[in-house]
Amino acid sequence: MGRAWGLLVGLLGVVWLLRLGHGEERRPETAAQRCFCQVSGYLDDCTCDVETIDKFNNYRLFPRLQKLLESDYFRYYKVNLKKPCPFWNDINQCGRRDCAVKPCHSDEVPDGIKSASYKYSEEANRIEECEQAERLGAVDESLSEETQKAVLQWTKHDDSSDSFCEIDDIQSPDAEYVDLLLNPERYTGYKGPDAWRIWSVIYEENCFKPQTIQRPLASGRGKSKENTFYNWLEGLCVEKRAFYRLISGLHASINVHLSARYLLQDTWLEKKWGHNVTEFQQRFDGILTEGEGPRRLRNLYFLYLIELRALSKVLPFFERPDFQLFTGNKVQDAENKALLLEILHEIKSFPLHFDENSFFAGDKNEAHKLKEDFRLHFRNISRIMDCVGCFKCRLWGKLQTQGLGTALKILFSEKLIANMPESGPSYEFQLTRQEIVSLFNAFGRISTSVRELENFRHLLQNVH
């Protein structure tokens, strides 16, 4: 036995020396390399690279953004989680504890936020809200003519066909305030056929894809023809290609969060949440996902650039003296607006912004139709969020789709923003409080995803 073992070791040594002599000795590939080897350099359809985004986000933006999102104005979000699914009836509700959402008690939400979720100032919040949609024109006669006109214009705009999302009726008895800090986005155990169906309907019916083209790794479809799919994708116009990449990037961002805040330990004493590298590998490893994982991560960076560009464009709206992050606490409101403007000016200084002028730049009639298709497809995706069986997943799905929809609304409203008056009501361009809260929280999710990728790079360095 000893002689045989010695012979085996000797043979292995000879093989190693031969490989070394031929220059073939290589260190084993790490999991970090398999997940991130393609997540570098310049992004498709952009002039920006991954490394610039990492440095800007992780060291200049992320810490300040997290501080802003912890403030009262941004942590409370009103949402209706009881809306029925408009597409199918057989929703299997997740019964796990971690799928549940704990709404706020009435006395937990600042009065300034509860009084009117779409108004920005103390003066505007004195306006009595109408009890029913049919009575929105019945404005308090004690208000000035200018204010009455502003309220009617806001309502008209908020109900207009320019919206990229199906907006919840926040006056509905089923709409409740949720503290986002107490209901964080993390792994809930919601998976399987129901979760697959949500994403399948989003990709198959809302991303401009014909049924004859099969998505890579599509559930239940057998082995995909990857080259066929990407040849089709590259043949699309830039707008439709961008649409797919935005949805893929959002999907990737959600999966990063589920891997970064995974339930590692669940006992009667405590729950321990943290990074699950195995879960991350299953979702993004280049070998395990047949090359799809790294592509999805690149799409996450593309999504980051789109929302970053929208925030840079909307700066004039927030700079107006009349705008406040109104909660009723004057000192805190002033500090939060100062921090908000500091963040937006930092974003404005980003050197490699996405150029949205390439969107809808052709024939006017064709561009108008394409923009409308773009809007309707995204609006439909926002409706699909009401079909998610996990309430916590539904909460964050609705918030993030509304946030991305708001970003798209901003990008396609550049002229309206440029023509806003420096003071007084803005009739042409308006953002509700719901849109503002979802916009910044959605970008906060993507910013956190980019930050978490750095953590996973380090954690996977020594994993093979």
UniProtKB/Swiss-Prot annotation:
Enzyme activity is tightly regulated to prevent the accumulation of reactive oxygen species in the endoplasmic reticulum. Reversibly down-regulated by the formation of disulfide bonds between the active site Cys-94 and Cys-130, and between Cys-99 and Cys-104. Glutathione may be required to regulate its activity in the endoplasmic reticulum. One of its GO terms (cellular component) is Golgi lumen. Its cofactor is FAD. It holds the Pfam family ERO1. FAD binds at residues 186, 188, 199, 248, 251, 283, 296. GO terms for molecular function: FAD binding; oxidoreductase activity; protein-disulfide reductase activity; thiol oxidase activity. Keywords: Apoptosis, Cell projection, Disulfide bond, Electron transport, Endoplasmic reticulum, FAD, Flavoprotein, Glycoprotein, Golgi apparatus, Membrane, Oxidoreductase, Phosphoprotein, Redox-active center, Secreted, Signal, Transport. Residues 1-23 form the signal peptide. Its EC number is 1.8.4.-. N-glycosylated. The Cys-94/Cys-99 and Cys-390/Cys-393 disulfide bonds constitute the redox-active center. The Cys-94/Cys-99 disulfide bond may accept electron from P4HB and funnel them to the active site disulfide Cys-390/Cys-393. The regulatory Cys-99/Cys-104 disulfide bond stabilizes the other regulatory bond Cys-94/Cys-130. One of its GO terms (biological process) is brown fat cell differentiation. The keyword DNA-binding does not apply. Induction: Stimulated by hypoxia; suggesting that it is regulated via the HIF-pathway. By ER stress in a DDIT3/CHOP-dependent manner. InterPro entries: Ero1, ERO1-like_sf. Belongs to the EROs family. This is ERO1-like protein alpha. It comes from Mus musculus. The lineage of its organism: Eukaryota, Metazoa, Chordata, Craniata, Vertebrata.
